[in-house]
Curated annotation (Swiss-Prot):
Gene Ontology terms for molecular function: flavin adenine dinucleotide binding; tRNA (uracil(54)-C5)-methyltransferase activity, 5,10-methylenetetrahydrofolate-dependent
PANTHER family: GLUCOSE INHIBITED DIVISION PROTEIN A, METHYLENETETRAHYDROFOLATE--TRNA-(URACIL-5-)-METHYLTRANSFERASE TRMFO
Keywords on record: Cytoplasm, FAD, Flavoprotein, Methyltransferase, NAD, NADP, Transferase, tRNA processing
Chain spans, region Disordered: 433-453
Gene Ontology terms describing biological process: tRNA methylation; tRNA wobble uridine modification
Organism: Anaeromyxobacter sp. (strain K)
Localization annotation: Cytoplasm
Reactions mediated catalytically: uridine(54) in tRNA + (6R)-5,10-methylene-5,6,7,8-tetrahydrofolate + NADH + H(+) = 5-methyluridine(54) in tRNA + (6S)-5,6,7,8-tetrahydrofolate + NAD(+); uridine(54) in tRNA + (6R)-5,10-methylene-5,6,7,8-tetrahydrofolate + NADPH + H(+) = 5-methyluridine(54) in tRNA + (6S)-5,6,7,8-tetrahydrofolate + NADP(+)
Official protein name in the record: Methylenetetrahydrofolate--tRNA-(uracil-5-)-methyltransferase TrmFO
Length: 453
């Protein structure tokens, strides 16, 4: 395979994972990333694999669907999971990372790989056939390339994601904030908590509703992903919605009083040293002046908050994957092009990396002249593939982005004791099914990790 060069466009989680999987199988890769020549509105760091929303890759517990996906990716030698483990910061049972060190680690691994050539330029045209290419340009695909992709697929849609603010640690009032992880998970100081009584909470919700928001372009109708809703959009759904959502106080009793607040704002550390903390669930489209005003005035403990980063919104572009893509993630109308990551309609960092891995394996199968061998459907990777092909959805389904969830898995057979029993059955079945699929992988220089448990 060494004489064949594959182009990977996009240096995010999907693109870097695809490039890594191809390179470790002996394929020469040209990884094209538009930074620093051009940056999207949401990108700040100079390196690859920049995390622009949260610094959390979510639950690392395999009894959670995304935690099971973590496990499967580790077993398959994932670059993203390997670097995440190396740069992990305490976050209870979640896999959170120091985002700068994580980006640096991914960048270094690919820069040092002899089979990878990184090119920094913006592409405005899709690569022509017959050479194979992986398009992993993500939710912030530049306009020119997005237009070319729309012409090719006829399937472009977009909605908006929103980014949460980050606060400098020294500006948080520790006489008000208290350290505690929900239900006592983790080391106990993975999160800081800002308690709100009922009056404070209601005043905050009213401020969110009245605050000035960034307007969308007149020709674009915002379509938010339910898993990343702006906090003010949730507030619009009802007075107590936030108190039952990201500000839920359950399991976060104030150790100084022994009482549960009416609502709690959680802050999760951004780095190992805890110099910066992000406001969990506070994705927002409030204007920057309004964010400073509202969060300082209405959130206890943030009266003197210094914001390392303020929230913002950005467009998310994705194709109607079940109709646009073949089962091997190649574009039906242009089979030399493979899509990976959020542009396919997967949602989440880990799902994007997993999609990059799947696209790379599909390319390897194409190069070897064999049919694509999809992951077993009962695995987390297989469930994600079922989402992309539409197999997990009813006929006529209005395709929307999705995280990996057990609802995407094939139904279980037999009887299982409660929700926990069903999760355990899903995990046991997935582990059994993944092993033989791993054995079909092309030879690599990096051994796969053993199964957990």
């Amino acid at each position: 395979m060494g004489d064949t060069r594959v182009t990977v466009i996009g240096g995010g989680l999907a693109g870097t994972e695809a490039a890594w999987q191809l390179a470790r199988a002996g394929v020469a890769v040209e990884l094209v990333e538009m930074k620093p020549e051009r940056r999207s509105p949401a990108h700040v760091l100079p390196g690859l694999a920049e995390l622009v929303c949260s610094n959390s890759l979510r639950s690392d517990n395999p009894l959670n669907a995304v935690g099971l996906l973590h496990e499967e990716l580790r077993r398959l030698g994932s670059l993203v999971l390997g670097c995440a483990d190396e740069t992990r910061v305490p976050a209870g049972d979640a896999l959170a990372v120091d985002r700068e060190r994580f980006s640096e680690a991914v960048t270094a691994r690919l820069t040092d790989h002899a089979a990878v050539r990184i090119v920094h330029r913006e592409l405005e045209e899709l690569p022509p056939p017959p050479a194979l290419a992986v398009i992993a340009t993500g939710p912030l695909t530049a306009d020119a390339l997005a237009a070319r992709l729309a012409e090719t697929t006829g399937g472009r849609l977009h909605f908006y994601d929103a980014i949460a603010p980050i606060v400098a640690a020294e500006s948080i009032d520790r006489s008000i904030a208290y350290a505690r992880s929900r239900y006592g998970k983790g080391s106990g100081d993975d999160y800081l908590n800002l308690p709100l009584d009922e009056a404070q909470y209601h005043a905050f919700v009213e401020a969110l509703l009245q605050g000035e928001k960034v307007a969308a372009h007149g020709f674009e109708e915002p379509r938010y992903f339910e898993g990343c809703l702006p906090i003010e959009v949730m507030a619009e759904r009802g007075l107590e919605v936030l108190a039952h959502g990201p500000l839920k106080p359950v399991g976060l009793e104030d150790p100084r009083t022994g009482r549960r607040p009416h609502a709690v704002v959680q802050l999760r550390r951004e780095d190992v040293d805890g110099t910066a903390w992000n406001l969990v669930g506070f994705q927002t489209r409030l204007t920057w002046p309004e964010q400073r005003r509202i969060f300082r005035a209405f959130l206890p403990g943030l009266a003197n908050a210094e914001f390392v980063r303020l929230g913002q919104i950005h467009r998310n572009t994705f194709v109607d994957a079940p109709r646009v893509l073949a089962p091997d993630l190649s574009v039906r109308a242009a089979p030399h092009l493979f899509l990976a990551g959020q542009i396919t309609g997967v949602e989440g960092y880990v799902e994007s990396a997993a999609c990059g891995l799947l696209a790379a394996r599909a390319v390897l199968d194409r190069l070897a002249g064999r049919a694509f061998r999809p992951p077993p459907p009962a695995t987390a990777l297989g469930a994600l593939h079922r989402h992309l092909t539409g197999e997990a959805h009813p006929p006529g389904y209005d395709y929307q982005p999705s995280n990996v969830v057990f609802a995407l898995f094939p139904p279980l057979t037999g009887r299982h004791r409660g929700k926990a029993g069903r999760k355990e059955a899903h995990v046991e079945r997935a582990r059994k099914e993944l092993a033989p699929w791993i054995d079909t992988a092309p030879p690599t220089a990096v051994p796969a990790a053993p199964a957990a448990g």
